[in-house]
Amino acid sequence: MGHRTRMILVLTLVVMSIWGSDASAMQKTKFDAPLLTEKIATNRSIIVDIEGKGDYTSVQKAIDAVPVGNSNWIIVHVRKGIYKERVHIPENKPFIFMRGNGKGKTVIESSQSSVDNVASATFKVEANHFVAFGISIRNDAPVGMAFTSENQSVAAFVAADKVAFYHCAFYSLHNTLFDNKGRHYYHECYIQGSIDFIFGRATSIFNNCEIFVISDKRVKPYGSITAHHRESAEEKTGYVFIRGKVYGIDEVYLGRAKGPYSRVIFAKTYLSKTVVPDGWTNWSYHGSTQNLYHGEYKCHGPGAERQKRSDWAKDLTKQEVESFLSIDFIDGTSWLPVWLQEKF
């Protein structure tokens, strides 16, 4: 059996729309800008061009131009360039599709550290129904700031429901992605950081994402990729990483406990030797580990060895993990323009 055939058997690509299914779209294997534009189906657009060949030269000015209480999709096309600004999508401006020209081509960056995570963010999403494609978001705060009290340097703060990022990249040294609340979908994104660089209380699927670990000399012995905060069993939240890979230039934990019911799962993910043997830590959390839900399912690579895993770390079965790998974990069939459904 060839590699292509095996992949078809393992994965079922589901490309649907909240406005109805499309049989021809289901054959597509790439979630690109034309497909998303087709599914979002709007002719309302604003063009941002740093060279002055569009409607605005600033991303924030384009957002400001979206009507308050917007109830229909509008495309904000941010053409290639490095936009040195901080961007805020306020709560009263939902249904925005921010379309870049590709991560590495369309870049939004600032250099801001703060004692407060939200205050430091380069990019803030507080409006429901937000979709982004092909954009890099950076917080380039100097490394030296890491040794002061103003050491938070968030790239993106996501505090809204029904938010999706496709082929985007997030860069910072510390606390890169504040995935705060709501249902979120990250597809083939790149996320770089060192300490707690994906953190918050959200309900999120990270599908085929690259997690790159960089060095931070503040941390002895290691930093952590995730710090998911969950206070009770009733909270239907958690971070689920499906496929993708974890690699980098420093050692790291997959996650640390943040609250007694912290929930993070890595499934079918390549774990390089960057991942330390313990895998998980309760660093700074001094309560019981009984209700922590830190688990792995069919991960592979040198960092996936389980002999020395933390006592509470779970080696999940198919039955235990199946509901988390379903797009229904984030109710995605009702709001995502396109998604990938994992099949066993």
Curated annotation (Swiss-Prot):
Transmembrane segments: none annotated. Substrate binds at Q152, R256. It is an enzyme of class 3 (hydrolase). GO terms for cellular component: extracellular region. Pathway: Glycan metabolism; pectin degradation; 2-dehydro-3-deoxy-D-gluconate from pectin: step 1/5. The keyword DNA repair does not apply. It catalyses: [(1->4)-alpha-D-galacturonosyl methyl ester](n) + n H2O = [(1->4)-alpha-D-galacturonosyl](n) + n methanol + n H(+). Its EC number is 3.1.1.11. It is found in: Secreted, Cell wall. The active site is at D196 (nucleophile). Pfam families: Pectinesterase. Residues 1-23 form the signal peptide. Expressed in flower buds. GO terms for molecular function: pectinesterase activity. GO terms for biological process: cell wall modification; pectin catabolic process. The keyword Secreted applies. Belongs to the pectinesterase family. Acts in the modification of cell walls via demethylesterification of cell wall pectin. This is Probable pectinesterase 67.
